[in-house]
A protein has these predicted regions:
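Short, flexible coil/linker segments at or flanking structured domains
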Residues: 14-16, 37, 46, 74
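Short aromatic-centered micro-motifs
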Residues: 21, 48-49, 71
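Intrinsic disorder/low-complexity segments enriched in polar/small residues
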Residues: 16, 25, 29, 78-81
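Terminal, regulation- and interaction-focused segments at domain boundaries
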Residues: 1-24
Protein backbone atom coordinates (compact mmCIF):
# COMPACT_ATOMS: atom_id res chain seq x y z
CA UNK A 1 0.00 0.00 0.00
CA UNK A 2 1.34 3.48 0.82
CA UNK A 3 2.96 2.76 4.23
CA UNK A 4 6.37 3.91 3.06
CA UNK A 5 8.35 3.96 6.31
CA UNK A 6 6.40 1.56 8.51
CA UNK A 7 8.07 -1.79 9.16
CA UNK A 8 7.02 -4.96 7.40
CA UNK A 9 5.82 -6.53 10.68
CA UNK A 10 3.52 -3.60 11.43
CA UNK A 11 2.14 -3.70 7.88
CA UNK A 12 1.36 -7.40 8.29
CA UNK A 13 -0.39 -6.72 11.61
CA UNK A 14 -2.40 -3.91 9.97
CA UNK A 15 -3.50 -6.28 7.21
CA UNK A 16 -4.59 -8.91 9.76
CA UNK A 17 -6.52 -6.34 11.81
CA UNK A 18 -8.30 -4.92 8.74
CA UNK A 19 -9.24 -8.38 7.48
CA UNK A 20 -10.38 -9.52 10.94
CA UNK A 21 -12.60 -6.46 11.43
CA UNK A 22 -14.16 -6.86 7.98
CA UNK A 23 -14.83 -10.53 8.73
CA UNK A 24 -16.56 -9.49 11.98
CA UNK A 25 -18.94 -7.24 10.03
CA UNK A 26 -17.31 -3.84 10.51
CA UNK A 27 -17.73 -1.30 7.70
CA UNK A 28 -14.62 0.59 6.59
CA UNK A 29 -14.23 4.29 5.90
CA UNK A 30 -11.01 6.19 5.09
CA UNK A 31 -9.90 9.78 5.08
CA UNK A 32 -6.62 11.40 4.11
CA UNK A 33 -5.17 14.67 5.44
CA UNK A 34 -2.30 16.24 3.57
CA UNK A 35 -1.59 19.85 4.51
CA UNK A 36 1.01 22.28 5.78
CA UNK A 37 0.88 24.27 9.00
CA UNK A 38 3.71 26.75 8.66
CA UNK A 39 6.67 24.58 7.77
CA UNK A 40 5.19 21.41 9.28
CA UNK A 41 3.85 18.92 6.76
CA UNK A 42 0.94 16.78 8.02
CA UNK A 43 0.26 13.60 6.11
CA UNK A 44 -2.32 11.37 7.83
CA UNK A 45 -4.41 8.46 6.70
CA UNK A 46 -7.24 7.62 9.07
CA UNK A 47 -9.26 4.44 8.78
CA UNK A 48 -12.52 3.90 10.64
CA UNK A 49 -14.13 0.52 11.21
CA UNK A 50 -17.75 0.94 12.29
CA UNK A 51 -20.30 -1.48 13.70
CA UNK A 52 -23.23 -0.19 15.72
CA UNK A 53 -21.96 2.11 18.49
CA UNK A 54 -18.36 0.88 18.25
CA UNK A 55 -15.77 2.58 16.07
CA UNK A 56 -12.14 1.54 15.82
CA UNK A 57 -9.92 4.32 14.50
CA UNK A 58 -6.48 3.62 13.03
CA UNK A 59 -4.57 6.83 12.33
CA UNK A 60 -1.29 6.56 10.43
CA UNK A 61 1.02 9.57 10.40
CA UNK A 62 3.09 9.06 7.27
CA UNK A 63 5.28 12.06 8.14
CA UNK A 64 6.91 10.35 11.12
CA UNK A 65 5.71 6.73 10.75
CA UNK A 66 3.53 6.55 13.84
CA UNK A 67 0.25 4.72 14.30
CA UNK A 68 -2.40 5.72 16.83
CA UNK A 69 -5.38 3.46 17.47
CA UNK A 70 -8.48 4.52 19.36
CA UNK A 71 -11.76 2.98 20.41
CA UNK A 72 -14.87 5.16 20.20
CA UNK A 73 -18.16 4.21 21.84
CA UNK A 74 -21.45 6.10 21.42
CA UNK A 75 -19.71 8.84 19.44
CA UNK A 76 -17.09 9.65 22.10
CA UNK A 77 -13.46 8.65 22.27
CA UNK A 78 -13.23 5.92 24.86
CA UNK A 79 -9.49 5.24 24.99
CA UNK A 80 -6.35 4.67 23.00
CA UNK A 81 -5.67 0.99 22.48
CA UNK A 82 -2.82 -1.13 21.16
CA UNK A 83 -3.06 -2.21 17.53
CA UNK A 84 -2.52 -5.83 18.59
CA UNK A 85 -5.55 -5.67 20.96
CA UNK A 86 -8.14 -4.50 18.43
CA UNK A 87 -9.37 -7.92 17.31
CA UNK A 88 -9.79 -9.17 20.86
CA UNK A 89 -11.96 -6.11 21.65
CA UNK A 90 -14.04 -6.22 18.45
Amino acid sequence: MFDLNITHEVNELLKQVRKGLRNKGYKESKSRTNRYIGTIHLNYITEYFIKGNLVFEIERDLSNSTITTRLHYNGKEHKEIRLADILSLA
